[in-house]
Amino acid sequence: QAVFSHETALFFHDLTDREPLKYTITVRTGYNPSRLQEDGFQVYTVKKDLHEIGIIAMQTSFGHSVPVYDMERTICDLLRSRKNIEMQVFQDALKQYAKRKDKNLRMLMKYAAMFHVEKILRPYLEVLL
């Protein structure tokens, strides 16, 4: 139901060295996030058909398997929410992503088109790659 996203997903993927002050999760539209917000989570909502895209399982430091959005989805989510995040965090994460051997630029551009951030993402990538 809830998927770790945004700054929290960056931390899971080692794309930032900032441990999130608040864990960030994404739920599908229609889900009542008030309990999660009361528990201290920052909650984003997304349409049901976009919610499942890019979910992978990752291990916490305690060995628990949790749902997290993949790196490519996380980058697109950050751009979609750019009014709510520090752009420096995004730029640093994108620089780290560009250095990774396991990056998938084809998938990143596919997601960027699906999430309508392609025109915003492209200039950043042209500088980095």
Specify the residue positions occupied by each region the protein language model found.
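Nucleic-acid-binding surface
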Residues: Q1-L129
